[in-house]
Amino acid sequence: MTIMAPEAVGESLDPRDPLLRLSNFFDDGSVELLHERDRSGVLAAAGTVNGVRTIAFCTDGTVMGGAMGVEGCTHIVNAYDTAIEDQSPIVGIWHSGGARLAEGVRALHAVGQVFEAMIRASGYIPQISVVVGFAAGGAAYGPALTDVVVMAPESRVFVTGPDVVRSVTGEDVDMASLGGPETHHKKSGVCHIVADDELDAYDRGRRLVGLFCQQGHFDRSKAEAGDTDIHALLPESSRRAYDVRPIVTAILDADTPFDEFQANWAPSMVVGLGRLSGRTVGVLANNPLRLGGCLNSESAEKAARFVRLCDAFGIPLVVVVDVPGYLPGVDQEWGGVVRRGAKLLHAFGECTVPRVTLVTRKTYGGAYIAMNSRSLNATKVFAWPDAEVAVMGAKAAVGILHKKKLAAAPEHEREALHDQLAAEHERIAGGVDSALDIGVVDEKIDPAHTRSKLTEALAQAPARRGRHKNIPL
């Protein structure tokens, strides 16, 4: 059953109406309901998103606050069955207070069946959540089980609301602070993208459908046309912090945006989707503006999940590396940096899609291994001419290796001796040439040809796709 465009449905329509929300998401005139409208609290439909057949469901905020009962959950499960059979992406538009209390355990069982359908679809079809109202209680886990979560400004995601938190723990918190988009974008990492408003949330969801389902092909001529001296974006001092995002956008196509995920959570790692020479790619980049670009427990976990997402959907990876190591500290050790850091090693180690590493300035220690190194079977490892590949920086290394020699030197000669030893150490063990000799770097490249080199390496590699679920690490 095809429905009318939103403007033809009637101006008096409640803005929470699921028919209106689905119409705002799908291409005009393409919406076909998958069942008759009812009081179940859910409306599911098929339609197109820029021509891509897509399945979507919307919890109905006008009926019991979108609470999920047996019938509504059945509609969602049926929508998933259709999407899996069609191999179509599925989008959930969420405005729900959780399970229907009046239906008791039956509702809980039905919500669990929705979760099972999501897990069954994981890694097989793209799942995108657009949260436009509450996603509370059991409904909070629906978006969390999907691949990408987009939150509108008025959305709220939490398992227990402020009143329960206050009565149990004594903590006084409002809904926005507890489960608003800024909270989940900065503190919890639940939210991948914060939209400007509800309509922008639908636009972001539509853009994601295109990136996942209209991946395109590498166009070498487009790569050459976009080549510029990206090296100029690095600061002159090798010790100065900088934001890596301009380098990322310079590598990617200028005519399409870079959709960064979880920008404010674990910000020392930048991840997101964009296009390189016409094709969808995933980008991971250390960001020296935050924590000097160090890996820590959260950024390693963030990167690991993103690698597995891209691998599950056959999206090649570009890994931009400028990393001094893992962030030291008691908080990191107690916060699980070993366990969570191992996730990134595992993610790259099992990754099957083409993945190319570019070392721009430095890569040291264990973080060198974790950032898609040759030892983890990177497709190619490129480095700019001044890059360092080492266990640690040369100055720090000689401070350990030649501690006694430096201590014995006259004080007025110590600094010059330290510089001399550091230069010698870098020549032997830390420069790009040494890494080339060993074979852990494939090629030293001119920064002005970065786009062409990355495109060529990814285009020549066999297209592959991992066969695994996308667990929300």
UniProtKB/Swiss-Prot annotation:
SUPFAM superfamilies: ClpP/crotonase (SSF52096)
Disruption phenotype: Essential. Cannot be deleted. Limited expression level affects growth, mycolic acid content and cell morphology.
Residues with the N-acetylthreonine modification: T2
The keyword DNA-binding appears for this protein: no
Binding site for (R)-haloxyfop: A99, G138, H185, W334
Record has Membrane as a keyword: no
Oligomeric and partner information: Homodimer. The biotin-dependent acyl-CoA carboxylase complex is composed of AccA3, which contains the biotin carboxylase (BC) and biotin carboxyl carrier protein (BCCP) domains, and AccD6, which contains the carboxyl transferase (CT) domain. The AccA3/AccD6 complex forms a dodecamer.
Record's miscellaneous remark: AccD6 is dispensable in nonpathogenic strains.
Official protein name in the record: Biotin-dependent acetyl-/propionyl-coenzyme A carboxylase beta6 subunit
Native source organism of the sequence: Mycobacterium tuberculosis (strain ATCC 25618 / H37Rv)
Lineage: Bacteria, Bacillati, Actinomycetota, Actinomycetes, Mycobacteriales
Gene it is expressed from: accD6
